[in-house]
A protein has these predicted regions:
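N-terminal intrinsically disordered/low-complexity leader segments
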Residues: 1-20, 206-212
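Short, structured helix-loop boundary elements
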Residues: 22, 43, 65, 69, ...
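Helix-turn-helix
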Residues: 24, 28, 32-66, 70
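Short hydrophobic clusters on alpha-helical segments that form packing/core surfaces
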Residues: 25-33, 79, 106, 144, ...
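Amphipathic alpha-helical packing segments from all-alpha helical-bundle domains
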Residues: 77-83, 97-100, 104, 108-112, ...
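Short linear capping/connector segments at secondary-structure termini
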Residues: 85-89, 120-127
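Hydrophobic/aromatic-rich alpha-helical bundle segments in the mid-to-C-terminal region
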Residues: 117-122, 130, 150-198, 210-212
Length: 212
């Protein structure tokens, strides 16, 4: 079986006009995905919604997979921007408060465009972007690792890097299933409470060991 080609833009926009065109195309792709779904998201349809020629689309994106990848990257950047701000505000908070608020920020970010997030999760394997998604999600790791490092003595964590990956994987796994199967739960404070208990149950045994 032939290996799946990784979707990617045809070229990176350098000038302001080019960047503006790419933004128009990415926004049009988002609208098509949300309104019509992945199957109907063709380069011709994107050009129509964007109000540009098909040639303008192909100037920057060779196919619909690369367009969807660009949507995914922008969506992840928006989620991460929200997390960076919240984590910086929690640098000196106590453990329970920081975990609770950090998870609240993650849920709030997921609520920005849950339908889009769900569509992207469904189609990532089809566009050969699973590795890229892992790369983008991996950008959370240094943020969480830095926060764990500040609480290292309190938690008794010997390897904040590993701990960060375990925590991110656990929470992202839950959120992915919620988005796919129970999207209404994103609005429930109860989900935040359960995730807080999940994370603290992983971290608190380290606290007990450090006090022996």
């Amino acid at each position: 079986m032939a290996s799946r080609r990784r979707a990617s833009p045809r070229k990176k926009p350098q000038q302001r006009r080019s960047r503006a065109m790419v933004e128009v195309l990415v926004e049009a792709t988002t609208r098509v995905l949300l309104k019509d779904g992945y199957e109907a998201c063709t380069t011709n349809r994107v050009a129509e919604v964007a109000g540009v020629s098909i040639g303008s689309v192909y100037q920057y994106f060779p196919d619909k997979e690369s367009l969807v990848l660009a949507v995914m990257e922008r969506h992840q950047e928006q989620l991460q921007a929200a997390m960076v701000v919240r984590l910086s505000e929690l640098a000196n908070a106590d453990l329970a408060t920081a975990v609770h608020e950090m998870l609240g920020a993650m849920l709030e970010a997921q609520r920005l465009q849950p339908r889009l997030h769900r569509v992207l999760l469904e189609q990532v394997p089809r566009i050969g972007a699973l590795r890229r998604l892992h790369e983008l999600n991996g950008q959370y790791a240094p943020l969480v690792e830095a926060w764990l490092e500040t609480h290292r003595d309190q938690l008794g964590i010997t390897n904040p890097s590993v701990a960060a990956w375990v925590l991110i994987g656990a929470v992202e796994g839950v959120l992915a299933r919620v988005l796919m199967e129970k999207p209404g739960w994103l609005e429930l404070g109860l989900l935040q409470e359960h995730l807080t208990r999940l994370v603290l149950s992983y971290l608190q045994p380290n606290v007990r060991r450090s006090k022996r």
